[in-house]
């Protein structure tokens, strides 16, 4: 029976080496003796020896046992490996089915979702628009195709869990077995012995992405547009996540949006309000002629049908709500003052203050049916 070499000697480290030093030594030797890279006849045997040494020395509990008892372990029974994972179910499986029971390994993980805030104008929100955006995301490494391993090599079986993706430990009391995800391979069952130079073993690289986003008519601020598959790439070749484009509509100089209705304040002077007039009212599509009857009051509301924002999930559009604002002059010349004084005398017997004023916002609520 061949005598096993000292594990510290195999990795070329001191007995008081730190975990970081042990890990660096393992990576260096694994790269040197990996069978896909080193074609020497004894390369595979040396690679297995390096994996075995690292499996023990990278685990504090196994390393402590090895430091105390060496290869034999505390119970030097022939054929007994004190550093093998305690898995009573595995031996039963092998007895009946001639195979090895493997722990449940995680499949490819989906990449993270990303968010992008897209600023658009008021008009673009009403009519819709196509915008080209540019953002950064993680993409699958083209060199290793997401595996993380140097091209021409493959990930190797995890030396800590033996490829199970989990660690089984027998509790000293109650004869129970606890199962935890392997912290070395993170449940994948394999580790990267020779990392890809392009992505440094990550399997992904950060790239700039440029795409065209179609913004539908009638969209409003805080709306989200989901673009499938445009988020980050998943680790180890996993599928891409989604990109969520969050809409930010810039305010308009004089239009205010309320749901699918568009509100406009229309300033009128005192004469126009008293005598009535015809005015060209600006809308999102141009101007509309609006008749203002004589005696219109401040805060009066007029509705122009079908001149609001389109409904997102159905046909039709909202309305434009025109709210009258009577502007009282503040600087009168002598002639205007005399005219107002004469008007005031003629209105001395007219009742005032006996009408309930609902206020500006009250009138708008009534117009909107709120």
Curated annotation (Swiss-Prot):
Which coenzyme or cofactor does it need? Zn(2+)
Q: List the disulfide bonds.
A: none
Q: Which Gene3D superfamilies match?
A: DnaJ domain, Heat shock protein DnaJ, cysteine-rich domain, Urease metallochaperone UreE, N-terminal domain
What are the subcellular locations of this protein? Cytoplasm
Q: Does the keyword Zinc apply?
A: yes
* UniProt repeat feature CXXCXGXG motif, residue ranges: 141-148, 158-165, 182-189, 196-203
Instruction: State the coiled-coil residue ranges.
Output: none
Q: Which GO terms describe its biological process?
A: chaperone cofactor-dependent protein refolding; DNA replication; protein refolding; response to heat
Subunit composition? Homodimer.
Present the record's domain note. Answer: The J domain is necessary and sufficient to stimulate DnaK ATPase activity. Zinc center 1 plays an important role in the autonomous, DnaK-independent chaperone activity of DnaJ. Zinc center 2 is essential for interaction with DnaK and for DnaJ activity.
Q: What role does this protein play?
A: Participates actively in the response to hyperosmotic and heat shock by preventing the aggregation of stress-denatured proteins and by disaggregating proteins, also in an autonomous, DnaK-independent fashion. Unfolded proteins bind initially to DnaJ; upon interaction with the DnaJ-bound protein, DnaK hydrolyzes its bound ATP, resulting in the formation of a stable complex. GrpE releases ADP from DnaK; ATP binding to DnaK triggers the release of the substrate protein, thus completing the reaction cycle.
Q: What protein name does the entry list?
A: Chaperone protein DnaJ
Q: Which organism is it from?
A: Roseiflexus castenholzii (strain DSM 13941 / HLO8)
